[in-house]
């Protein structure tokens, strides 16, 4: 943070640098790509290939399945989904992101390349499809070694985060065992 002046996802306008990795690679003849979540200041024009995904789906939805996935994640599974997700393993973000990256890499036969693969998961909406949903039983997970009582020791940032969690997961304490199992799945 002291070098770039950026400490969070929310203060990208404050970024400070003379040259970045993508720029150096492009100057040296590399083809560049981003597949997945853009946790940077980069824009589509900065790279040769761009396929961005957010927490609620692909940013540019092209297929009916991508549109349905985004609808489900945005409207039904906003914070978490406590049942097996209707999104198939083939349509889950990590699978799509990896497949798109591999397809792009295949086209780079004669080119040096850099591909940034970044998954939105594990992150809310916490949803997972079969067979992963059933892999970890909530009642067999280790007991948590922390609770909301520890927030008093953690400071303001953690209290704000807890408020955000409560807003997206109104029954968080009750649902936490299933959410943890989904996260691991």
Segments (PLM) and residue ranges:
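Active-site-proximal cap/lid insertion segments
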Residues: 59-96, 104-185
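Catalytic-site neighborhoods of secreted/periplasmic enzymes
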Residues: 1-90, 97
């Amino acid at each position: 943070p002291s070098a770039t002046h950026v400490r969070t996802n929310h203060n990208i306008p404050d970024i400070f640098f003379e040259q970045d990795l993508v720029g150096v690679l492009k100057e040296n003849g590399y083809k560049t790509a981003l597949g997945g979540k853009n946790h940077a200041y980069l824009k589509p024009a900065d790279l040769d290939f761009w396929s961005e995904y957010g927490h609620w789906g692909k940013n540019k939805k092209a297929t009916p399945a991508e549109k349905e996935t985004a609808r489900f994640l945005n409207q039904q599974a906003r914070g978490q989904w406590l049942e097996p997700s209707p999104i198939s393993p083939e349509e889950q973000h990590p699978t799509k992101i990896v497949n798109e990256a591999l397809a792009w890499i295949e086209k780079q036969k004669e080119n040096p390349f850099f591909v940034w693969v970044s998954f939105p998961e594990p992150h809310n909406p916490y949803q997972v499809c079969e067979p992963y949903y059933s892999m970890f039983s909530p009642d067999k997970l280790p007991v948590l070694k922390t609770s909301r009582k520890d927030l008093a020791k953690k400071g303001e940032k953690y209290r704000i985060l807890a408020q955000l969690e409560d807003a997206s997961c109104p029954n968080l304490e009750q649902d936490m065992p299933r959410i943890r199992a989904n996260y691991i799945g």
